[in-house]
Amino acid sequence: MRTPRRHCRRIAVLAAVSIAATVVAGCSSGSKPSGGPLPDAKPLVEEATAQTKALKSAHMVLTVNGKIPGLSLKTLSGDLTTNPTAATGNVKLTLGGSDIDADFVVFDGILYATLTPNQWSDFGPAADIYDPAQVLNPDTGLANVLANFADAKAEGRDTINGQNTIRISGKVSAQAVNQIAPPFNATQPVPATVWIQETGDHQLAQAQLDRGSGNSVQMTLSKWGEKVQVTKPPVS
């Protein structure tokens, strides 16, 4: 039988994980490849929008820089797929002054997590808590962030996970930000930066939403379109 204290702790942790997952850091490099004049930013954002809308799988890494009220996450890393919808990964967060490291799996619509090390628990339908694969939802996920990216301006070249990218600054509508990152509670356009492959498919390599005062959420995508295999974990 679950004790009330343990049950409450599970609910609190799962809430933190679900909030973290809605916002999907990046493994970025400070190097800046040399090159000629910077390309026009708007076409790159449009290309990345189309690519991200069509994306069915990817590896996602998220880091919270600074502090954002309602978000106890430190990092989240996972492989996501929408065909079929599934996810597997790890989340690190701070709750009640304690550091928590938990693995999670979404399989056949059910969310599993190891709130106790090496012990998988069934938390029921992922849709009732959060399905991390919805980060790839073309209507509310990262594709929607790009579709609502305004005032795009190419700022420079950076290498992200070995990819040569163009760093583009701009602003994202409050509605798009709140759909992917509810803790922002944005009421006006949010300053943002995206890193898009300069050549090739122009995939989105990284995105950052800034909340001010050095606080931000930074998201990285890689392994675009690669097969993601998720297996059902053994439940204790």
Curated annotation (Swiss-Prot):
Gene3D superfamilies: 2.50.20.20. GO terms for molecular function: glycolipid binding; phosphatidylinositol binding. It is a lipid-anchor. GO terms for biological process: lipid transport; response to antibiotic. Modified by Lgt on Cys-27 with an S-linked diacylglyceral, signal peptide is removed by LspA, Cys-27 is further modifed with a fatty acid on its amino group by Lnt yielding a triacylated protein. Probably glycosylated, which is required for T-cell activation. Residues 1-26 form the signal peptide. Disruption phenotype: A single deletion mutant leads to loss of expression of efflux pump Rv1410c due to polar effects; in infected BALB/c mice 1.5 and 2.5 log decrease in bacterial load 15 and 35 days after infection. The single mutant increases sensitivity to malachite green, sodium dodecyl sulfate (SDS), isoniazid, ethambutal and ethidium bromide, alters the permeability of the cell wall; both genes of the operon are required to fully restore the phenotypes. Bacterial LAM blocks host cell phagosome-lysosome fusion and is one way in which M.tuberculosis evades the host immune system. This is Lipoarabinomannan carrier protein LprG. It comes from Mycobacterium tuberculosis (strain ATCC 25618 / H37Rv).
